[in-house]
UniProtKB/Swiss-Prot annotation:
Upper lineage: Bacteria, Pseudomonadati, Pseudomonadota, Betaproteobacteria, Neisseriales
Site entry (Important for tRNA non-discrimination), positions: H30, G81
GN (gene name): aspS
Subunit structure: Homodimer.
Locations listed in the record: Cytoplasm
Protein name listed in UniProt: Aspartate--tRNA(Asp/Asn) ligase
HAMAP family: Asp_tRNA_synth_type1
PROSITE patterns per record: AA_TRNA_LIGASE_II (PS50862)
Gene3D superfamilies referenced in this protein's UniProt entry, alphabetically: Bira Bifunctional Protein, Domain 2, GAD-like domain, Nucleic acid-binding proteins
Length: 602
């Protein structure tokens, strides 16, 4: 019987006999004495086996990395000069008396302590990958966060209620994952993109405070922070306004960080969406980086430089500057790389000015400003740019000029990239936790491709008081009672006050060009139940995967999920998705128009 975990044996167990079980992390033979580092989920302990115990010595001699052993022995101090203060077990070792080989192991595809393994190799051999201490720590922290959330919400009076995994398809936003019904040929269930409508109906039913930690599914193009199936901390409340909901969920975030990381997040400032976009070009600004946009659109309307003038005069156009302290030292190669980088976001180029001498702001050859564009700008404009940005000698000013969407995305991404690469050495990056709330989102945004307005969050978000009429008369300026929790440039949670009146919900659907017939077909069950005395209600959903990724410092959410999918939505461990035989398809009344092709990653 095991008496202790390997990584938890300390000096308090000196001279005691213990039994540990685990995997051979490393085996060393030193002059006839064998050393084994035995590993389990709590860490590693050093075991010494000498020839005086021949059976144990023989078992140790035949063991290799990843063999599973049971070891009984006496705890003793390590010799002077061989201790490791970074480990709980770093000052002791076990002198083995008995060793039992519980299972042999084939040679693993990589060493457990190898840090230079490709992600595809790791995901193909995920079980072995999960033995690595970093993965064990990540998933343990994930568990601690989930348990902390449950404890906090339970103390706040929330009830854990499960909602269906098989529901109806409502194709708004991302694509649904569909499940064919055998019992109802030709009809399909959808896996939920969120429990949104069910949790609202639970409020109508009178449960007052609901939560669950649940799987959600979206068939969308994947990025580093996306998965086709992801875990959501979902909650909903009745009779609370947005300030009260934000206070509860902010308290939850603070408690979780304190318990799991011993970090005090402090109070969360609140920033209107318009301010976030104006100064940072993003609705999830990374406040660790002390760089802001400077607005130049008005200034460029009277300039002759076509690149800037054209953007300033364009409907929905924008011209901004981004001052980077000490950036004049950037090489031509670095600037070219930044130019290529902003091109990813649709920018056609990256204009810049290096500030060498603010006392000489002419546009002539002797100018204290170094740039190919200086000669195209008036001296008045150059002086105004320096004044507005506050640029000093040694700075560089980058410019964005295009449609506002392109400028915001391109220069916003450049702000992050420059800040992370150069900010710490130059005083404009603070390496600490910087949370905030972004509030007062627009209710709608115009989708040029679809030629209609679409909901910024979702169509069940309530408009701000006094903005109801704007949904029809001026949808572009209609604000929503929505709020996002942002941490270090990541949106970790988003929510809103919901629409609790059927007539208002119908108005929102109408503004989104959803006909009354389509409303009834897709959302009739919601509209019908809102008429039975629905209380005012609202809520929020956290992305558990994203939250834990931030807390662990992992490079991808795939590093905090036990069995994730790749960026092509495949499981390399099980080779899912896979083709199925014709018999299964016939049972589901399905026939393939196109046979499956081999697209597995290698």
């Amino acid at each position: 019987m095991r008496t202790n975990y390997c990584g938890l044996i300390s000096e308090q167990y000196l001279d005691q006999t213990v039994t540990v079980k685990g995997w051979v992390h490393r085996r060393r033979d030193h002059g006839g004495v064998i050393f084994i580092d035995l590993r389990d989920r709590e860490g590693i302990v050093q075991v010494v086996i000498d020839p005086d115990t021949p059976e144990a010595f023989a078992a140790a001699d035949s063991s290799r990395n990843e063999y599973v052993l049971s070891i009984t022995g006496r705890v003793r101090n390590r010799p002077e000069g061989t201790t490791n203060d970074k480990m709980i077990s770093g000052k002791i070792e076990i002198l083995a008396k008995e060793i039992e080989v519980l299972n042999a192991a084939a040679t693993p595809p990589f060493q457990i302590d190898d840090e230079n393994i490709s992600e595809n190799v790791r995901l193909t051999n995920r079980v072995i990958d999960l033995r690595r201490p970093v993965m064990q720590r990540n998933l343990r922290l994930r568990y601690q966060v989930a348990m902390g959330v449950r404890r906090y919400l339970d103390a706040q009076g929330f009830i854990d209620i499960e909602t269906p995994m098989l529901t109806r398809s409502t194709p708004e936003g991302a694509r649904d994952y569909l499940v064919p019904s055998r019992v109802h040929p030709g009809e399909f269930f959808a896996l939920p993109q969120s429990p949104q409508l069910f949790k609202q109906l639970l409020m109508v039913a009178g449960f007052d405070r609901y939560y669950q930690i649940t799987k959600c599914f979206r068939d969308e193009d994947l990025r580093a922070d996306r998965q086709p199936e992801f875990t959501q901390i979902d909650l909903e409340t009745s009779f609370l306004n947005e300030d009260e909901i934000m206070d509860i969920t902010e308290g939850m975030a603070k408690q979780v960080f304190k318990d799991a990381l011993n970090v005090d997040l402090g109070d969360f400032p609140r920033m209107p969406y318009s301010e976030a976009m104006f100064y940072y070009g993003s609705d999830k600004p990374d406040m660790r980086i002390n760089l802001k946009f400077t607005e130049l659109t008005d200034l460029m309307k009277t300039e002759e430089f076509k690149v800037f003038r054209g953007a300033a005069d364009m409907k929905g156009g924008r011209v901004v500057a981004l001052r980077v302290p000490n950036g004049a030292e950037f090489s031509r190669k670095e600037i070219d790389e930044y130019t290529k980088f902003v091109g990813i976001y649709g920018a056609k180029g990256l204009a810049y000015i290096k500030v060498n001498d603010v006392s000489n702001l002419s546009n002539g050859e002797d100018s204290g400003l170094q740039s190919p564009i200086v000669k195209y700008l008036s001296e008045n404009a150059l002086k105004e740019i320096i004044a507005r940005t506050g640029a000093q000698n040694g700075d560089i000013i980058f410019f964005g000029a295009d449609k506002a969407k392109v400028v915001n995305e391109a220069i916003g991404a450049l702000r992050i990239k420059v800040g992370l690469e150069h900010g710490k050495d130059n005083g404009y990056f603070t390496d600490e936790w910087k949370p905030l709330w972004v509030v007062d989102f627009p209710m709608f945004e115009y989708d040029e491709e679809a030629d209609r307005y679409v909901a910024v969050h979702h169509p069940f978000t309530a408009p701000k008081e006094g903005h109801e009429d704007l949904m029809v008369s001026d949808p572009a300026n209609c604000l929503a009672r929505a709020y996002d929790m942002v941490l270090n440039g990541w949106e970790i949670g988003g929510g809103s006050i919901r629409i609790h009146r059927a007539d208002v919900q119908e108005k929102v659907f109408a503004a989104l060009k959803i006909s009354p017939e389509e409303q009834q077909e897709k959302f009739g069950f919601l509209l019908d139940n809102l008429k039975f005395g629905a209380p005012p209600h609202g809520g929020l959903a956290f992305g558990l995967d994203r939250l834990v990724t931030l807390m662990t410092g992992a490079e991808s959410i795939r590093d905090v999920i036990a069995f994730p999918k790749t960026q092509r939505a495949q499981c390399l461990l099980t080779n899912a998705p896979n083709s199925v035989d014709d018999k299964q398809l016939r049972e589901l009344s399905l026939r393939l128009r196109q046979k499956a092709t081999e697209t597995k990653e290698v």
